[in-house]
Design a protein with these regions (language model features):
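Motif- and composition-driven signal specific to adenylation
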Residues: 1-154
Length: 156
């Protein structure tokens, strides 16, 4: 993939999110369609950063998809080889600076109306500021429009 993140057979993914949240689709099918193993995380565990961290380490999770707010509450210790995919909200620079060193970390963007995500960033780099939304996925396009639905110039 152009992003540098490619699901692969044998990876261990988590299913942390409610089925009502579109990120759950990425979690489930990202693992299952690529020959991975899906760890279904109980709601009681997702609500406890310490318990979630312990599960991630014990299950040797390879791919973790989380909101930046949730991952900001987790320790990186023991998760050095875990690929992190953030989405669902803007990802602040502090989260990138904490989680990007030494690992694949990408940002997905897409309103629920797009049924998951429409863009993915290149691998994020510490010290580069807030995470960009990246480039459109194949067969998609992104446009920035003004209040009258007219295209705005680059950089606006």
């Amino acid at each position: 993939a152009a992003t540098g993140f490619t699901p692969a057979p044998g990876q261990v993914w988590t299913q942390c999110h409610s089925y009502a949240f579109d990120l759950s689709v990425f979690e489930m099918w990202g693992a299952l369609l690529h020959g991975g193993r899906l760890v279904v995380v109980p709601e009681s565990v997702t609500g406890s950063p310490a318990d979630l961290h312990a599960l991630l380490v014990a299950e040797q999770v390879d791919v973790l998809a989380q909101t930046p707010s949730a991952v900001a509450m987790l320790s990186t210790q023991g998760l050095e080889s875990t690929t992190l995919v953030v989405g669902g909200e803007a990802c602040p620079a502090e989260v990138v600076d904490t989680w990007a060193p030494g690992r694949m970390m990408v940002n997905q963007y897409g309103p629920s109306e797009t049924t998951m995500y429409v863009s993915m960033s290149a691998p994020l780099v510490p010290g580069s500021g807030p995470a960009p939304i990246g480039v459109p996925v194949p067969r998609a396009a992104l446009f920035v429009l003004d209040g009258w639905l007219r295209p705005v110039p680059a950089g606006v």
